[in-house]
Amino acid sequence: MAISVITPIYNEPCENLERFCALLAAQKGEFEVIFADASEPNFYEGKNFDLALNLSKIFSPERFKILPCKKGRGTQLDAGASVAKFEKLLFLHADSAFCDEGAILAAERALDCCEAGYFRLKFDEGGVLLNLIALCSNLRVKFRNIAFGDQGIFIRKSLFNAVGGFENLAIMEDYKLSMKLKRSGVKFCQLGQNIVTSARKFRREGIIKTLIKMQILQYKFRNGASADEIAKSY
């Protein structure tokens, strides 16, 4: 069996993409990679970086796709899922990383037994507050069954399509998907592997300030605020 890895990108820094390609090259198992690319025209021109060339050094042509699409993470992820060859899907952000070379393979195998799952979140920087936020994120999925995109959501394609995918949302597309799965009675399973995500937003805007802001926006979304309204405050 195999799995389709779907990654949305929009003007992603070249160094992030180079690191991400190296991460993919180190992963075990059979998988294809789909980049749902909404980057501005000519964004990478003159930057001495060619995503297709980098991928061609790692994968045979049938194992990767660069899919031009409209901006909007939900739209991009849905577009990637629509062209995925395999029944198993893993949605992975370009600023995420794995410490375990068998992480993608573990997600693929987990979908033999469960319908959807996620990895344990860890930040790329230490500190008591960031470690506590990561712990609370993992406990949130365990007890409330709400997973976010930076936790590496994986799911069977048939189930993903049955609940309507991510939908065309400017933000909170992962939250909406989790709520739909929760209403359908689907329980996320947690893998033992960590997924490492960037703490740059917390560092840039302040850890406490960012945490409070996110909780307020999630509360508003749960209580009927539109994704467009939330995006203006994000």
Give, region by region, the residue ranges found by the protein language model.
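A conserved acidic beta->alpha catalytic loop
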Residues: 14, 37-51, 96-97
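Short, well-formed alpha-helical segments that are part of the catalytic scaffolds
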Residues: 12-26
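Short active-site alpha-helical segment characteristic of glycosyltransferases
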Residues: 173-180
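Short beta-strand/loop segment that forms part of the nucleotide-sugar
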Residues: 20-21, 30-41, 65-69
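A conserved hydrophobic helix/loop-capping motif in glycosyltransferases and polysaccharide synthases
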Residues: 3-12, 27
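Conserved donor NDP-sugar-binding/catalytic core segment of glycosyltransferases
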Residues: 101-129
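Glycine-rich, basic loop-to-helix element that forms the pyrophosphate-binding segment
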Residues: 68-84
